[in-house]
Each structure stands twice: as C-alpha cells, then as structure tokens.
Amino acid sequence: MKQLFRQWYDLSEIKKELTTRNWFPATSGNISIKVSHEPLTFLITASGKDKTKTTPDDFLLVDHVGVPVLETELRPSAETILHTHIYNNTNAGCVLHVHTTDNNVITNLYSDAVTLQNQEIIKALDIWEEGATIHIPIIENHAHIPTLGENFRKHIQGDSGAVLIRNHGITVWGRDSFDAKKRLEAYEFLFQFHIKLLSIQGGVSNGANSYS
C-alpha cells in the first residue's frame, strides 16, 4: 500500500509540472507509473479529466491489460493500450504521452521518422558519442485503437524510448519517472530547436507540408 501511495504522489507531481508547461491542452494526454511488477499493475490518468486540477480521481489502478483493479466509475485513458504494451514488453517504470504544438508539427514535416543530430541535449537520452544522431519513429494516428496499439508495439525496443503519432503527440517511456520526464523534456527541446532552425532556413527540401 505504501508503494501505491508513493507512486500516486510521484505521478501527481509530474502531472502538476507538465501542466505548468501547457502540455495537457483540452484534457489531452495521459501518463502512468508502474506500481508492481508481479502482478503487473500501474496507475494511469482517468479519461476526460481536466489535468490542470488535482483531485482524488486523477488516477486509477489497472492491471496488465488495462482493466481497473478496484471497482470504480472512472475509465482509463483511451490510449491505455500503449502503456500496457510498454509495461508488458520492457522494464520501464513510467510512460508519458503529451500533445504539444511542436511534436505535432514535426509529424507533419516527416513521413516515417524524424532524424535529429549533433545536439548536446541528446546526452539526456543516455547517448554519449560526439555528434550523435537519433531517429524517432512516426506512426499513423489510427482511430481503431487495437491497430494503433499494434503499430506502436513494433517500435518498443527497450526500457526507454519514444514514438510520435501523427497529429497525436509523443509517447515517451523511461526506467522511472525521473528518466521518463528527462527524456520528454529533451525531445521537446529538440523539436522546438529543429522547427525554429527550419523557419530560419526556409523549410525542408523534401517533406515540408507533405503530411499536413
């Protein structure tokens, strides 16, 4: 029980911090944190809640397939399947899914992935080589959630990572809440920098507006 309360507090603090950055506009986004490994349970944001508010109904505890563990009238977020795929296939401890203007713009500039390189902040992703290059996959935003989940699952390759969904934000996961938040901050910095650089350079040679 102590672990549940501890993780609840941790997730609530993350929600507050991301809210101050306006990363949950119009009730969008969802976040989760693992509570137990065996059996697998995790806390996830309840669907349709105003994340700028803090209430006792912010989160609910679900099992390995996203079904509430305790009787509740709350519904887990629609994209809970993405979280279950991550927790069932990795040792990740926290998953953050947010919609920002920058991460949506990026998915309108590129097709299957965005490549970013030679930025110091890439070290926040535990990539230390000089001039490092990263590739962030972009998948289509299928309205059929099982199809979205299956396409997402193909890009889960470790205990930390990120996947962009076209016009539907980014999902980032990490070993724990600190690691996941650090990675999300790094990706959002990289997106913002890349978009500003393109605006100065006059756009991309191929791909700009191709997916808008």
Swiss-Prot record:
Details of cofactor binding: Binds 1 zinc ion per subunit.
Binding partners and assembly: Homotetramer.
UniProt keyword terms in alphabetical order: Amino-acid biosynthesis, Lyase, Metal-binding, Methionine biosynthesis, Zinc
One GO MF term attached to the UniProt entry: zinc ion binding
Source organism superkingdom: Bacteria
Family of the protein in this entry: Belongs to the aldolase class II family. MtnB subfamily.
Native organism: Bacillus cereus (strain ATCC 14579 / DSM 31 / CCUG 7414 / JCM 2152 / NBRC 15305 / NCIMB 9373 / NCTC 2599 / NRRL B-3711)
InterPro entries associated with the record: Aldolase_II/adducin_N, Aldolase_II/adducin_N_sf, MethylthioRu-1-P_deHdtase_MtnB
GO BP terms in the entry: L-methionine salvage from methylthioadenosine
EC number: 4.2.1.109
Main EC class the enzyme belongs to: lyase
Stretches that traverse the bilayer: none
Catalytic activity: 5-(methylsulfanyl)-D-ribulose 1-phosphate = 5-methylsulfanyl-2,3-dioxopentyl phosphate + H2O
Gene label: mtnB
Signal sequence residues: none
Summary of the function given for this chain in its UniProt record: Catalyzes the dehydration of methylthioribulose-1-phosphate (MTRu-1-P) into 2,3-diketo-5-methylthiopentyl-1-phosphate (DK-MTP-1-P).
Pathway(s) the chain acts in: Amino-acid biosynthesis; L-methionine biosynthesis via salvage pathway; L-methionine from S-methyl-5-thio-alpha-D-ribose 1-phosphate: step 2/6
Matching HAMAP family: Salvage_MtnB
Name of the protein in its database record: Methylthioribulose-1-phosphate dehydratase
A Pfam family this chain is assigned to: Aldolase_II
Positions that bind Zn(2+): 97, 99
GO terms under cellular component: cytoplasm
Cofactor(s) needed by this chain: Zn(2+)
Gene3D superfamilies: Class II aldolase/adducin N-terminal domain (3.40.225.10)
